[in-house]
Amino acid sequence: MRTLFLNPPSFQGFDGGASSRWPASREIESYWYPVWLCYPAGMLPDSKVVDAPPHKISIEQTVEMARDFELLVLFTSTPGFEVDCRIAEMMKATNSKLKVCFVGPPVTVEPEKTLNASSAIDFIIRREFDYQIVDYANG
């Protein structure tokens, strides 16, 4: 499956703390790249990693990417969770065949709440997700 690994766009003016998911956009030009998304992407030919906040990729630009992929792996965070759900819904509306997987701390802490948050979320993976995503994408 052609897979998009997404650190989604942030909402305007949000300034958060450093982690492997940097959901903030700010004046600092030094960001951690999304390490945990890069590991499985390296095992899936023809996949793509998009780190939207530091590259100022808009929600609209991100949604358009849905047309080119079969699987979306979205690394969510607690501060951005609601916005991330809306982005997933918009991407699924653009490509109804897109499978959407959420990963990240909120998924691990509250898996049922995550699954029930949006009909766009097809499945979640708690904790470490790198090999599970690769297995899923490879069928």
Label each PLM-derived region with a short phrase:
Residues 1-31:
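Short glycine-rich His-centered loop
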Residues 36, 40-139:
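Glycine-rich beta-alpha loop elements in corrinoid/cobalamin-binding modules
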